[in-house]
Amino acid sequence: MDAQAIERLLDELAARVDTRFEGVQGDYRALIVVNPTDAPYTGVAVLHVDMPLKAGSEPRPAAVWTPDGVRIPCQILHSRLEPVAEWRMPDGSVRPLPDGSRRWRFDLAFWVDGLPPRCYRVYRSAWSADELPLPTLPATEPPVRVREAIPHPGELGKEGGFG
C-alpha cells in the first residue's frame, strides 16, 4: 500500500470503528494502529502529535492500554514547545489563542504486540501521572501507522483485517 492508500484507510477506519471503551470514564482518545505490511508486527508505534497547550499548562505523561484494558509501555519522545498566538482548525479556520499559549509537538510512542499483517487494532490513550518505559526506542519510522480518534460508536470492532 502506498502512503495515500494508507491515509485513506485510516480515514475510513477512524469513521467506522467503534472507538469507545466500555466502562472507561474521563477524557481519553482512541489510537487506531494499522499494519499495512505482509508480516506480523511487534514493536513501537508512533503517533506524531501537534497540539495547543493552554497558558499555565505543562506537558504531562501519557498512558496507553490495549483493547482488553492492559496498560502497555508508552513514552512521550522529542517533546518541544514554542509560543503560539493562533491555531489552525481541521476545517481550515484560524482560532486565536489566549496569551501564553504554546504549541506542543511530540511523538507518542507505544508498544504494539503481535499485530497481524494487513490488520488494524484500537488502543486507548489518556494523560497519566507516569509512563511505562518502552523496552526499546524506535531508531527509524515504524512500518505501522497510527491515527487518533475521539471516542464514538461504529460498526467495526476493535481489531480486524482489511484488503
What residue ranges belong to the model's regions?
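Carbohydrate-active enzymes and regulators
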Residues: 1-163
